Regions:
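N-terminal helix-turn-helix
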Residues: 1-83, 87, 244-252
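Signal-transducing coiled-coil/dimerization helices and immediately adjacent hinge/linker segments
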Residues: 255-264
Length: 264
């Protein structure tokens, strides 16, 4: 019985967090119905979990029946960035990648059933993709998300796919296709997507590892219309080199007062 209560508690906590992660730069405000649909929750559950988030001062109603995050969440985000050696180590590598390739460079981390853009650097020239940092995406859509999903242990990966199917029954027909794609991603060591999340954008992602475990994905995205075969090959190579550089940087012993850098 104790195990059952714990399982129920964990599932409830997961749903609260999924609801909070529905907010991002593309969706700073949302009605309860929209949040429930995005999180795959019954409307009654969404109301209940939002009440808890309001009680903790993490969301508030804007007066028009829509909800938004409070400044308390921004403070948590700043604290997370300040404390994260991963984000600190990634920033110079993302900046170099964006500057040298002209693509948007983003670091993604996995939180529950979503991937969150933990850090992003946009190129100087227009890239038709902005406001990525802080956005969250489902694990079965987009190169960085699918790469993270592919890296999970088999039982965890299957559980995630099961939850995705419960939220969207249409996904059941795609299960074998999804699993085959994840096998391919693991075999070749990177993932690609073309307009899967952002229309007109081609993207490639590579794994960042620590102690032989994938902890993040590094992603480059650029308008597909600008990319011929040679350019896509160059972006694949740059993405993998950047991810390997970040992996090496994380393996270096910390140097107090100095940022760690690993050249790719």
């Amino acid at each position: 019985m104790a195990v059952s209560r714990r399982a129920v508690g964990v599932e409830s906590a997961r749903k609260v967090l999924q609801l909070l992660l529905c907010f991002d730069a593309a969706r700073p405000r949302a009605a309860v119905t929209e949040l429930a649909r995005a999180a795959g929750l019954p409307l009654s559950s969404a109301y209940r979990h939002l009440a808890l988030l309001r009680e903790q001062g993490l969301v508030e109603e804007d007066g028009g029946g829509r909800y938004r995050m409070t400044p308390r969440v921004h403070a948590l985000a700043r604290a997370a960035d300040a404390a994260s050696p991963l984000v600190a180590a990634a920033q110079p590598i993302l900046a170099r990648l964006a500057g040298e390739t002209g693509a948007t460079a983003v670091l993604f981390r996995i939180f529950g059933d979503v991937a969150v853009a933990a850090a992003a650097v946009e190129p100087r020239r227009p890239a038709h993709l902005s406001g990525v940092s802080g956005r969250s995406f489902p694990l079965h859509k987009g190169a960085p998300c699918k790469l993270l999903l592919a890296s999970l242990p088999a039982t965890v990966r299957a559980a995630v796919l099961d939850r995705i199917e419960r939220a969207d029954p249409a996904e059941r027909a795609l299960r074998r296709q999804r699993e085959a794609e994840l096998v391919l991603i693991r075999r070749r060591g990177y993932a690609e997507s073309d307009g899967e999340v952002d229309p007109g954008m081609w993207a490639v992602a590579a794994p960042v590892t620590q102690k032989r475990r994938t902890i993040a994905s590094l992603w480059l995205a650029a308008p597909a219309r600008r990319l011929d075969a040679a350019r896509r090959t160059a972006l694949r190579e740059a993405t993998r080199a950047g991810a390997q550089a970040l992996t090496r940087s994380l393996a270096m012993p910390p140097d107090p007062g100095q940022a760690r850098h690993a050249r790719y």
